[in-house]
Amino acid sequence: MAMQPSYPAPFGAAAISSSAGQEVASTIRRQFTDADADRIVETPLGEKADSSDTAGPDSEDGIDQEGHDKITALARSLSQISQKSAGPTNTFLDPSSDPELDPNSDKFSSRKWMKNLLHIKTRDPDRYPRRTAGVSFRNLNAYGYGTAADYQADVANMWLKGFGWLRSILGCRNRVQIDILRNFEGFVRSGEMLVVLGRPGSGCSTFLKTIAGETHGLWLDEGTHIQYEGISWDEMHSRFRGEVIYQAETEIHFPQLTAGETLLFAAQARTPANRFPGVSREQYATHMRDVVMTMLGLSHTVNTRIGNEYIRGVSGGERKRVSIAETILCGCPLQCWDNSTRGLDSSTALEFVKNLRLSTDYTGSTAIVAIYQASQAIYDIFDKVIVLYEGRQIYFGKASDAKRFFIDMGFDCPDRQTTGDFLTSLTSPSERLVRKGYEALVPRTPDEFAARWRESAERQRLLADIEAFENESPLGGSKYKEFTVSRAAEKAKGTRAPSPYTLSYPMQIRLCLRRGFLRLKGDMSMTLATVIGNSIMAFIVSSVFYNLDQTTNSFFSRGALLFFAILLNAFASSLEILTLWQQRPIVEKHDKYALYHPSAEAISSMIVDLPSKFLVSVVFNLILYFMTNLRRTPGHFFVFYLFSVTITLTMSNIFRWIGAISRSMAQAMVPSSIFMMILVIYTGFTIPVRDMHPWFKWLNYLNPIGYAFESLMINEFSDRRFPCAQYVPAGPGYEDVPLSSKICSQKGAVAGQDYVDGDAFINTSYRYFSSHLWRNYGIILGFFFFFLAAYIICSELVRAKPSKGEILVFPRGKIPAFVKKSRRDGDLEGAPTFEKQQLDNAGHDSTAAIVKQTSIFHWQDVCYDIKVKGETRRILDHIDGWVKPGTLTALMGVTGAGKTSLLDVLANRVTMGVITGEMLVDGRMRDDSFQRKTGYVQQQDLHLETSTVREALIFSATLRQPASTPHKEKLAYVEEVIKMLNMEEYAEAVVGVLGEGLNVEQRKRLTIGVELAAKPALLCFFDEPTSGLDSQTAWSICTLMRKLADHGQAILCTIHQPSAILMQQFDRLLFLAKGGKTVYFGELGPNMETLIKYFENKGSSKCPKNANPAEWMLEVIGAAPGSHADQDWPEVWNNSPERAQVRAELARMKEELLQRPPPPRTKEYGEFAMPLWAQFLVCLQRMFQQYWRSPSYIYSKAATSIIPPLFIGFTFWREPTSLQGLQNQMFAIFMLLVIFPNLVQQMMPYFVTQRALYEVRERPSKAYSWKAFMLASILVELPWNILMAVPAYFCWYYPIGLYRNAYPTDSVTERGGTMFLLILIFMMFTSTFSSMIIAGIEQPETGGNIAQLLFSLCLIFNGVLASPSALPGFWIFMYRVSPFTYLVSAVLSVGLAGTSVKCSDIEILHVPPPQGQNCSSFLDAYVQMSHGRLLNPEATSDCQVCPVADTDTFLAQVSISYSDRWRNVGLLFVYIVFNIFAAIFLYWLIRVPKKRSRKIKEE
């Protein structure tokens, strides 16, 4: 009897008979054929399978597609392999037992790991039920809605936009249905790969999003039928959400987390409940993470932060692979990849697609991929292809049959053109080739192509196949039940059956909590900055109110201190709105992946923030409470701290709720700023409750800060007697007056008492009652829980604003007629497309206008070294070459070879490092005008969003062409450039943003046009002009460069590995290897024969006939995945006769060119083409135009200048001249200053936008000087802010009634005009202050924080909250340097001076005179001395005294005099001028490259 093989208990079968094992093995062998096993011979990293791998009796060597359909979804990890032995190994418990199964081992084999895992799962199908998701679709029609015209909003027509929006809301506006996808049909079985081909705008992304269920802004026709092997579309995207994933081309991750932490989170969120027995969740997730990272070559990044554009982290390619790994770990059986190879070179793209192939083959998953510039090797990996043409389906079927289908139709595929390029070229009339004799038979329009497809026999077979496929998996059938059972087996205990999530809600919260603390650990800077900043602010505020005395003199100071304390505690969380918006795209992505509820992240984020909130609160409140000598008893301190912490948490919930209900950042920030102002005003300190007007008084009842402030005042004053510090009467002659004839000067005082009762004071002054203390706490808790629930609910339900589809935007009145017509007709392609332009301009040749270049640019022995971590690293190593007029030279190389570095060095754009070698123009050194006389087409398409295409070209031509060229001639040349680039139909279109503006190709053409408009006299540099473009657009760009070269332009162009056809456009090639070493420089020859012969003659393998020479060359030098170089090719080049010929030619060229007479020195050889004043005017004009076309900014500025002043005006409506009325008017002026930070923060982003464009593109091109830029940037703000002063003045000054104070002095007009001047100065100061702060700061958020800090200091030390006499001596300098000191002094004096005070009843002091005296004889001396007023001089009892007789006395108490108003005005103008000069100086100091600090050496 044969011994039974034993298996570890964790696999669910303690022992299994030999016959049972053989039965399993035979079943698997029936499922997997040898042919398919042979097809999968490589791991994702190009590792060859071991042909000597002999399988045991239970291993699965041959795998066919049918078998894969029957294997369970292993999408989290099933890209690995099994082992050689008959029994599987539990790699989760002990991965080190077999190095080939250990992802941390150098011997790890992903294929063996995969086979091992498959073996385990097939042994217990009941425990691990299978789950697959193919898809079929019939009559798929998708559409959106548009309007008859799309025009650019500006300040003038914004109202028309608003009316149109209102009409659409009311249903009065006719919406035009725009068809996007029309009559799509097809099916993809599980385990298959479908490639989606089409040009941008053809509907590729929409098709993928529809399959994946992301249909925001899209509508599906009622007849559309989509099902996923028995599961309906609706159910798949609700109950089974996350099983079909749309992978966008952008990478969105938390930058603070490491790659390992990011992927571990995804693995944990989808860790199934039906794991192998004995394997914990942590073990499972960690092992799966390690396997996938090893598979994708990410193991070395496990502890490296993801990073982003501001935080250093993994490279861009590694970040893209992290996104791919995250999708794999999500375990979805159907994946939609939207251009995920964008920006990758062809070898990296091939590696990515091979990974997908391995996953689908082993797991039975399904992949649908839209891909650009697919090489033949990539295309051949796919099973099926769908070709789209302007929203129509023109083919669906086997990838291997597509080429023959169209060739039989009458089209021709040139030699060496890939199948993918051939199929997409059919959608471009200028590129498709028709076989001879078929010219009248082939289709030409999208509708004709679609009709030919619908009439084809291939389509009839497809329909039959779809019917058979759907009959195999009817809705609700066996596959649906298997899918449901499989999904249920993975769900954790406590998860609802209809829930799409794998984890239960508490588990999701715990998982998000863990990630939240990791994020906090990864970036402690914000927490530390908050703690340090609040500590500093606590010390500053506490020093201002240091050690308050215990007498009635401290009443106002204590109230102001508690007001400041509660506001600082309440608004400590205001920036959480920004934090929420930074993470919102990530949370929404994970919700689509069904990793966790957004509300789970919301709850966890609040919990994660609690420790830092408590720490900040403890530090701030401890310092403030005890330094200022607030009520020093344990009970009262803890009451103070309890209310402070509670209001912090409550306001945090409110700010989070505002962020959650907003669908854009602007929607969140504008209401929050107005909301904060309302809370400040209606707290109860600036205007007491009894003085609030009824139309706004209700706001106090809805203000949680108001309840907290009342409780803090009660806590400080209740049950406490304060010794009187100032009696009435007092002073010389009143020393012997008995106490019975005196009264304390504070509210709530009683005659004859030497103290003031705290309860009486707060009752009289604020109507606060001690019984409200804990009632208020209960109300605050009510606010806390209400907004907590609201935040959680809204975070779950409200989604961010979806992006719009691609549309062109034109200035109003300049929309082309054909655009209007096409949109009325509901045509998706109504916007101009390149093919229409090509047809319209087929006979036009505008390149004749190009001035032929005559200079030769040549370089020899160019080296470039930089310092990296203290060590010198050579980036470029002795590069030789030249660019002659009329030639197109390609610069190629492997990733990291230094292509862009060489381009930057040659273009003189490098600002650090050491450069050696010769770079000459006609044998002479480059002069100051070199950068201006060269065109540099950057890889990034950077343009001002508000400019039109023509305006961008005119700007470049005006500033960069010589000043001697007439302006009319420059404009005429711009028109020629527009024709040359075939941009006539969108020349008036606004650049805009992607999706609402120019598309990718149009932007690239504009980038080229901007450089051509400068009429470069020397040469043009092109940096990756085809990166990220589809093959047809790349072809059009290359043909354009060829055309330019043919007309005399000299062009040097870096390019990622292009197709063979693209390479034929180039004359010469400079190829670099790793380390910046030359591999080849020379002619390409016809069909690249010269290049091929060079490598073949040097010992390389022969180039196959149909191979792409560019890819073959990479394989030869060992740069392609899985390839190895058999010799040192840079060394081969250095020793070759070809290099010797290059060196000889350089020597000859230098000698001959030096014999030419040097050009005469003229103004055209200066750094800039135009004088400074002309640069300034042109820049200023463009900036004014930008502001005019940014109505959201201007109207936000207007709203900030109108709504808060108007609200303040009606809050302090016609304030009387009582003591409280004067204080209210003073606070009305104080509150007007609160709009300052809002205006500042609005301005900064627009400056940063202009500066980024200038520094990245226009400064290196020497278009204009930084002085012109700074002066224009500062000046452009001033008119708008001056304009805003008008509504701010009228909305604030007159409602408050400040003009009435001028009646007694008969100076209403004069003081009204002075007040307007002061508001004007305030607005000008705000503008210039903003420019000064942001001039040298990188990010507007950082600038906003600095401005907020300086604003807070100015607010504290302006003399309102604390008078100069009350300030400690060492803070007097802050009072004197604060600009708000002089602004508040001027505004208060102009607004209040020169009128009498009329005390209200509660402000009148009732003093009993001594017996035998009337009030006049008793108090006349006192009121004259104190500048008060005696109201009843003849009375003999109850003398009524108003402590202040006129407003001048009131102002004198805060050191303000009306006579200083013009001095203050002059000082404010000094501050404005200082801001301007400081902005210019700071920009020069921080951001202008200094020649002496560039550390560049040219020898």
Swiss-Prot record:
Biased composition (Basic and acidic residues): 31-51
Residue stretches of biased makeup (Polar residues): 16-30, 80-94
Entry's transmembrane regions: 526-546, 561-581, 606-626, 635-655, 669-689, 778-798, 1193-1213, 1227-1247, 1268-1288, 1317-1337, 1353-1373, 1466-1486
SUPFAM superfamilies: P-loop containing nucleoside triphosphate hydrolases
Xref: NCBIfam families: 3a01205 (TIGR00956)
Membrane topology, as annotated: Multi-pass membrane protein
The entry's keywords: ATP-binding, Cell membrane, Glycoprotein, Membrane, Nucleotide-binding, Repeat, Transmembrane, Transmembrane helix, Transport
UniProt family annotation: Belongs to the ABC transporter superfamily. ABCG family. PDR (TC 3.A.1.205) subfamily.
Reactions accelerated catalytically: itraconazole(in) + ATP + H2O = itraconazole(out) + ADP + phosphate + H(+); voriconazole(in) + ATP + H2O = voriconazole(out) + ADP + phosphate + H(+)
Regulation: The efflux inhibitor FK506 impairs the transport activity.
Protein species of origin: Aspergillus fumigatus (strain ATCC MYA-4609 / CBS 101355 / FGSC A1100 / Af293) (Neosartorya fumigata)
Inducing factors: Expression is induced upon voriconazole treatment. Expression is also induced in triazole-resistant isolates.
Record domain ABC transporter: where: 166-415, 857-1100
Record note on disruption phenotype: Leads to decreased azole resistance, including itraconazole, posaconazole and voriconazole.
Protein name: ABC multidrug transporter A-2
Role: Pleiotropic ABC efflux transporter that confers resistance to structurally and functionally unrelated compounds including azoles such as itraconazole, posaconazole, and voriconazole.
Biological processes per GO annotation: xenobiotic detoxification by transmembrane export across the plasma membrane
Top-rank taxon, per record: Eukaryota
Single GO MF descriptor: ATP hydrolysis activity
Residue positions the entry lists as glycosylated: N339, N763, N1414
Major localization class: membrane
Residue ranges, annotated region (Disordered): 1-66, 80-107
